[in-house]
Amino acid sequence: MVNIPKTRRTYCKGKTCKKHTPHKVTQYKKGKDSIFAQGKRRYDRKQSGYGGQTKPVFHKKAKTTKKVVLRLECTVCKYKMQVSLKRCKHFELGGEKKTKGAALTF
């Protein structure tokens, strides 16, 4: 299990800062796919009408986890950057700190 605090003091590359400042940490989430992207328009056009599924549906999934991406926002100048972590099954943001001799709970 990976536990990351909600604030982190790290270097800010923004034009005004260029020094270590506190950053607000959030987890990156994928945005909604645009229906106007060229590939989506082409796919929808091909799918319309009779004839069933026209392109192969992917089934051979190899990975069991995704890499966690942190979004850091500077509290001073609002500059945002993204940092990727290693793969993990359990990710927690701002959870309680681990104490010695305590049992693991999920």
From Swiss-Prot:
This is Large ribosomal subunit protein eL42. Pfam families: Ribosomal_L44. GO terms for cellular component: ribonucleoprotein complex; ribosome. InterPro entries: Ribosomal_eL44, Ribosomal_LSU_eL42, Ribosomal_zn-bd. The gene is RPL44. Residues 36-56 are annotated as: Disordered. Keywords: Ribonucleoprotein, Ribosomal protein. It comes from the Eukaryota. Transmembrane segments: none annotated. GO terms for molecular function: structural constituent of ribosome. GO terms for biological process: translation. Belongs to the eukaryotic ribosomal protein eL42 family.
